[in-house]
């Protein structure tokens, strides 16, 4: 159980104080995860009404196509099927070539499914029929997609509004384009409305994520139990994947990360093919899906069964970062501030270890701690592992890698400049920080949000030398001699999925051991 902190102001060290914005004084609650029975029907109609409330429109037609059947270019083979998440949110149907419509005025939700001919069953099997879909999904009607165009002709009359996520999803074909010339096509309102609806989970969604986290946590435990007998990163991945698959969770929410040694310093390392021998720790980041809902858990394991002095010191700092931040989770907490708190704890720890040096206030003002804690503290979890955040940002950060055309990961980069801007925006009396469109500002936590808390400290030689040791502003605060001892550790990250409850939080991933329990499991003493 993490320490409960009930103060608005927490003294971090002798040079500053952290202001945590909280709108309630209730104490957080952590409970042991128990997986309740999975609800029988997907609450599509409840989701539709949440979307309608966010659209704030009394009329119009929402149209969402599902993922079509696909083949690779010049091939008769195709990728593994992955349903479009916005479509799934409004339907619950996890098979190809479907669509869903929602009539705002009549509150009528219709799922459109493909008709499966007998010869298709021979080759590919069948998909749920109309009667089965009505049992599985809370929709008003289920019809075949062969009837969809006729439905659209009848409902898209001059002056009506069609809501779609993307312009290329407008269901206009042939001469229908001319007849729909007076239909208003809205491609800007639906996605923000759906994002806002998705950010606070329904009870069904919480149950799905709870189940995904429970399966993933037990798979993490299985890896820890077998660790001393494993020789390669690939074996860690295999043990984990096998447990998930046999537990009914074949799909992973993201590429499994099993980075040992130097690879532990790469945030999205996923080659998972190097030997473990001679290395100190492995950062193991993996979370399965359950009915399309994600989980996201990270543990850092000592490969020999015992942490080295350097690895233990770093692990303790990261554990402190996580424990203290989780203890603040409750409705009304400004997540923005938790990242700043984690950064302060990281700096304090690195100064104590001697990796950082100098006047603490000057080190903080420079933002040099971002060399070692270079990503956001966490993100929403839902139908995407890095789920939508609604009209407000959890951390108010641009996706810098994506903006520059690079590979996009599930963590947001935090530079010294970004950290400084966050600190300035969080100062008492400061106005709400500006956010990039279409977001409005900083996000306070609400009941039934699910967020990760995933602090980490990394020693990536290329990153530190390329951007910090080469810059006099930061180099003067880094002790290169001490730092050299820590490169061998690679990195440490600890991550859990946290549900915001009425008056606190519930850690959904406690089944994955960490800390002293992790050491006992690895060494067969649990």
UniProtKB/Swiss-Prot annotation:
UniProt GO BP: proteolysis
Record-listed Mn(2+) 2 binding positions: 285, 296, 495
Alphabetical UniProt keywords: Aminopeptidase, Hydrolase, Manganese, Metal-binding, Metalloprotease, Protease
SMART domains cross-referenced by the UniProt entry: AMP_N (SM01011)
Function: Catalyzes the removal of a penultimate prolyl residue from the N-termini of peptides.
EC number: 3.4.11.9
Family assignment from sequence similarity: Belongs to the peptidase M24B family.
Sequence positions that bind Mn(2+) 1: 296, 454, 495
Catalytic activity: Release of any N-terminal amino acid, including proline, that is linked to proline, even from a dipeptide or tripeptide
CDD domains: Prolidase (cd01087)
Requisite cofactors: Mn(2+)
Name recorded for this polypeptide: Probable Xaa-Pro aminopeptidase GLRG_02280
InterPro entries recorded: Aminopep_P_N, Creatin/AminoP/Spt16_N, Creatinase/aminopeptidase-like, Pept_M24, Peptidase_M24B_aminopep-P_CS, X-Pro_dipept-like
Example of a GO MF term: metalloaminopeptidase activity
Cofactor info, note text: Binds 2 manganese ions per subunit.
